[in-house]
Amino acid sequence: KEIGDWVHASGFRRLFIINTHVTNFAPLRCALEMLRAEHDSFMVAVINSASISQRVREQHFHDADDWHANDAETSLMMAVSPSMVREELIAESDDEDRTENCVFSHPVNRTSTNGVTGKPSLASREKGERLFAWMVEDLSAIVRRGMKEESPLPHAYNESI
């Protein structure tokens, strides 16, 4: 929120926040709501990297709904930061998604035997390069669209309708 305040005070009227970690979404959304209430002319977007577009979302979720270190994430890391990938562990690391019928959200250590949910064994550097290119292309399109967007209706934040 403080960064958003600074961005607004610097004269910017649009802020695009790209979230790349699933548990950061809730506090980022709270910051968006506070910024919107405080700065009427400030437009803030929180964009989750795994849901930038339909094709990006399909790649992230194809092997698990509650994924963690799965095919998509492992492929991305193989492409952009290969030194952080322990390739010798990949073939043995697949772990099923155990959250299908859960009512509550559980931490990874209660849903995975090894910190993985999904199939990192399917990962490759080539898939990661393709996915990263899609993410850049699709996010760029969102930002270009957002740079032109105006509110659908002209009401001030605190104005009653």
Give the location of each predicted region.
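Extended, histidine- and acidic-residue-enriched regions that form the cofactor-binding/catalytic faces
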Residues: K1-L15, T20-I161
